[in-house]
Amino acid sequence: MRPQLSDYQHVSSGKVRDIYEVDDNTLLMVVTDRISAYDFALEPAIPDKGRVLTATTMFFFDAIDFPNHLAGPIDDARIPEEVLGRAIIVKKLNMLPFECVARGYLTGSGLKEYNANGTVCGIELPEGLVEASRLPEPIFTPATKAEQGDHDENVSFERVVQDLGQERAEQLRDETLRIYSAAAKIAEEKGIILADTKFEFGLDSEGNLVLGDEVLTPDSSRYWPADTYAEGIVQPSFDKQYVRNWLTSEESGWDVESETQPPVLPDDIVAATRLRYIEAYERLSGKRFIDFIGG
């Protein structure tokens, strides 16, 4: 008999995840179907999104050689039936206060900063780069973790050193880039470009660095089809960039600089986003989403 979600104490909720305490050492992390963009929670939710993100994270936890926060299998008996397939049991960690971003291509906030001053997070880049340009080598571009409702802020590597010390900062940078490169190779073999991604790390009780949160999902990464890749244009994508693109289109009527709540997503955008997330998982993993637990 599985426990009920109400049997666990609710600890916190973010834009997408709800956290519950299982015991002194472990948490239940529930991935909802909520979606956010530009630091706003959007309406409506994307059906099956929580399961897709969980399935993708589980695939990469298995594929990537680095300690992670998993504390049980996807069908762990401690997971309530009502969230089976979109929840995992995880170890409690002391989470570090930075999002660790790896970029292999120039787009998004990185492109905006580059166009302004030729750098990304203080890293000087060659002249003449445009939307979707491949960088000479992947770069580490950390960001502060914003509270819900606030904006994440890109920061320099020196800021990470200042807060965490040289050794820990270098470890974060080196492991972020190593994991990104390994994942990019997996994606490349499946005809997909991993343009960028972000990781969150924490420390376990012995001070070891551990991967937490989600990894390499369509929420935390930009995935582009390799067969249509071209510099200088916004790429079609298997991630929530599709939602971002609609929000900044004339059709939505929303001004990203307005600081106002974005409009409700149309049904066709919701449906297309769901299919993109599922396609990303199926192409990357080689598995059918319909076969993943909880369906």
Curated annotation (Swiss-Prot):
Its EC number is 6.3.2.6. The keyword Signal does not apply. It comes from the Bacteria. Pathway: Purine metabolism; IMP biosynthesis via de novo pathway; 5-amino-1-(5-phospho-D-ribosyl)imidazole-4-carboxamide from 5-amino-1-(5-phospho-D-ribosyl)imidazole-4-carboxylate: step 1/2. The keyword Ion transport does not apply. It holds the Pfam family SAICAR_synt. CDD domains: SAICAR_synt_Sc. It is an enzyme of class 6 (ligase). One of its GO terms (biological process) is 'de novo' IMP biosynthetic process. It catalyses: 5-amino-1-(5-phospho-D-ribosyl)imidazole-4-carboxylate + L-aspartate + ATP = (2S)-2-[5-amino-1-(5-phospho-beta-D-ribosyl)imidazole-4-carboxamido]succinate + ADP + phosphate + 2 H(+). InterPro entries: SAICAR_synt/ADE2_N, SAICAR_synth, SAICAR_synthetase_CS. Keywords: ATP-binding, Ligase, Nucleotide-binding, Purine biosynthesis. One of its GO terms (cellular component) is cytoplasm. One of its GO terms (molecular function) is phosphoribosylaminoimidazolesuccinocarboxamide synthase activity. HAMAP family: SAICAR_synth (MF_00137). Belongs to the SAICAR synthetase family. This is Phosphoribosylaminoimidazole-succinocarboxamide synthase. It comes from Corynebacterium ammoniagenes. The gene is purC.
